[in-house]
Each structure stands twice: as C-alpha cells, then as structure tokens.
Amino acid sequence: MSTDRELRKGSAETLILALLEERDRHGYEIAKLIEQRSNGVLTFHAASLYPLLYRMEARKLIQGRWVEKAGQRRKRHYSITAIGKRVLAERRSGWNTFIDALVRVAGLNHA
C-alpha cells in the first residue's frame, strides 16, 4: 500500500522535530532515520527535505549551524528550538487525538 502524499507532507515537520528532540542531526541523517524507523514507508529526498528544513529554520522551529570535521566537507547540523519543542508537543497531542478517532471510527488497530 502506498502512503498518501498529503499525509506524509503533513507529518514531515513533526517527524523532523521529534528526531531533533533526541539530538542534533544533519539533513542526510534525518532522512535516513525517517526511512529506517518507518521500515521504508516514509522517505524524503534532498529535493524536498532541505527546502523544508530551511522553512522550519526561518520559522524558528529549528536552528542550523555549520560543522566542519578534518578531512570532511562541512555539514549543516540542526537542533530543535524552544518554539520547536512547543510546536512538537502541540502536534503530538493533535496526532494522538486524530489517531484515537481513526481507531474508534474506522476500527483500525493502533500499536
């Protein structure tokens, strides 16, 4: 079954914020973790991920900084901000309410 694009799009910011709540990460790591943790159901390509990260940074949900390591090219690492943490808490609450409603109405199994 393919996952609806709009559902994926609507959850992307929440997924990114949740991963950054754990620790700072760079874009490629974020994309790979989303793919791994979703067992390949959710994938984000650079063409869509990086513009989203830039928009989230402009809205002060996350903060980026360049990190350089000897012998490697520099990478932009992102961290969640206080605003991002508040938004994540609100989104989690909203998703929980939404999922509970789907379970009740459509008879879905919720892990």
Predicted regions and their residues:
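Basic amphipathic alpha-helical segments that dock to polyanions
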Residues: 49-56
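Amphipathic alpha-helical dimerization/coiled-coil segments
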Residues: 85-111
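Short beta-strand/turn micro-motifs at beta-sheet edges
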Residues: 2-6, 66-67
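N-terminal helix-turn-helix DNA-binding core of bacterial DNA-binding proteins
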Residues: 4-48
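Accessory beta->alpha helical hairpin/"wing" motif in late/C-terminal subdomains of nucleic-acid enzymes
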Residues: 80-84
